[in-house]
Amino acid sequence: MCGIVGYIGRREALPVLMDGLQRLEYRGYDSAGVALVAGGRTWVEKRKGRLSDLQTVLGNLPSGCRVGIGHTRWATHGRPSDRNAHPHTDTSGRFAVVHNGIIENYAELRAELERQGCVFRSETDTEVIPHLIASCYDGDLVRAVRRAVPRLRGAYAIAVVCQQEPDKIVAVRAASPLVIGLGEGELLLASDIPALLPYTRQVIVMEEGWLAELTPEGVTLTTVAGEPVQPQVMRVDWEPGQAERGGYAHFMLKEIHEQPRALRDTLTGRLDAATGLVTLSEVGLSAAEVRALRKVAMVACGTAAHAGLVGRYLIERLAGIPVEWDLASEYRYREPLVDEHTLFVAVSQSGETADTLAALREARSRGARVLAVTNVVGSTVAREADWVLYTWAGPEIAVASTKAYSTQVVALTLLAIWLGQQNGRIDPAEASALVSGLQHLPDQAGQTLSLEAAVKEAAEALAGHDDVFFIGRNLDYAVALEAQLKLKEISYIHAEAYAAGELKHGPLALITDGVPVVALNTQPDLAEKTISNIQETRARGAFVLGLAQEGDEETARHCDRIFYLPRTHRLLTPALAVIPMQLLAYYAATARGTDVDKPRNLAKSVTVE
């Protein structure tokens, strides 16, 4: 997720901007830049890479500027590069803009603006904004922004400066955070509170649809339409490290709570509720090519592999295409049978996982078409694939993956529906029901987070055990695999997941009095069979924690404790079911005093085989 900073006041702006960007580094970024207004012009410097790379060119900027904006970019549209870094300007260089979010209709706006003579220098969606504002400008920056913003479709936060009005910053929030800092003789703007803390503890959190005009005289807040609003000034007493985590004790907990937003970003621009269709313009397969596919190869490591297993079930169910699911570390050693009629799907949060890259190259050498599902624009997996389905989860700092998993699951759900629509195998009524369910999924993820207190209590009881078993069938088994991985990697409790039907084939020998068993039972057509397996474990003395859809009283009767998910289409449960499992692992780990964000012996991105 990009970082925005802005400053107007009595100090020199550039050191404040650079300090603010440094305090937002935890959000992750691939490039950075600043814009200053002074001497009747707008000055911009930006560079791919770290802030230290940007620092090497700041000598080109004039000293003494009191107004400026800055940005750290996490690439979405256009790979990391100097020209794709922010700030972006209009053709004349009068207006400079920094932006966090996604402009869904940027392609049509760009085409329109190019017809008007605007010259674009980048591949980004952001660049349409300064051109659009310039086309609306009549001598009043606020009025120009008010005219331009309603034409933008998507989620965004923007800050704008203009050489004609050098003592002004205009900012707008639309579904992406912005915070204003109120200092002594100065105003600050940022996408997150840490950037403000060295200068002020008095902040205004901008609400949805607000426009802020920052000048040396103060800040004026209205709606984009110009209606007055009543801002609330709050005092922030966080310590800097705590502030970077948004007030959460750990990045992992913060990222668990970011999942409603992350899921919404994954879905943005990819659903058409009116037609019940999924739109994946980034996948360049024609309907005829999809019909010609003989199989899909789903390959990944770790958490991404568990998301891939969900994808396997869904693609076979909805698109009727056989799917081979492999761990990337094993893929090359079995002489895989792939050809030009195979769609190879490589799933990787970082896009740099060594084993996944090696498997991708093996499949490509055998003629497969390659689709990457990743979170990082410009990553090696993204560059080497034919097509990329980005998850838009935003930077994930904790080693244990949370929001990356749930967004991968949703991205693969979209892919399964889309493939079924392209080859005609999916029932239109089911597709429509799934699209409707996906639209509600981000809000339901928020509802699922309300289980936190109850899950924490259960996790603290679990923390004293040496072994925990997870069981489930079909999609629930895929989630059980991810649940056991989360528990073992951050709490260091030995945990195993089994397909519930496999209990009699060995695992039942390990079930004795008091052993915790977490039973996932969210699939109505399999509920009776899973309940039978729950009964088998309880007969051996197991303590059973159950997870089911709301209203499932039958499952509750056979569990010692039950957690309910909001009711949804059964094929959409994995993205919700994983949330209480993540919380269970998190609170078990905190109860045991482990390093949650940086568990021993593990790394965020595994770039060696």
From Swiss-Prot:
NCBIfam families per the UniProt record, alphabetical: glmS, PRK00331.1
Annotated CDD domains: GFAT, SIS_GlmS_GlmD_1, SIS_GlmS_GlmD_2
Origin organism lineage: Bacteria, Bacillati, Bacillota, Clostridia, Eubacteriales
Annotated localization: Cytoplasm
Stored PROSITE patterns: GATASE_TYPE_2, SIS
Record protein name field: Glutamine--fructose-6-phosphate aminotransferase [isomerizing]
GO terms, biological process: carbohydrate metabolic process; fructose 6-phosphate metabolic process; protein N-linked glycosylation; UDP-N-acetylglucosamine metabolic process
Primary location: cytoplasm
Single GO MF annotation: carbohydrate derivative binding
EC class name: transferase
Pfam family, one: SIS
Chain ranges of the SIS domain: 286-425, 458-599
Source species, domain of life: Bacteria
Repeat as UniProt keyword: yes
Subunit record text: Homodimer.
Start and end residues of each Glutamine amidotransferase type-2 domain: 2-217
Function of the protein: Catalyzes the first step in hexosamine metabolism, converting fructose-6P into glucosamine-6P using glutamine as a nitrogen source.
Keyword terms of this UniProt record: Aminotransferase, Cytoplasm, Glutamine amidotransferase, Repeat, Transferase
Catalytic residues (positions): C2 (nucleophile), K604 (for fru-6p isomerization activity)
Annotated EC: 2.6.1.16
An example Gene Ontology CC term for this record: cytosol
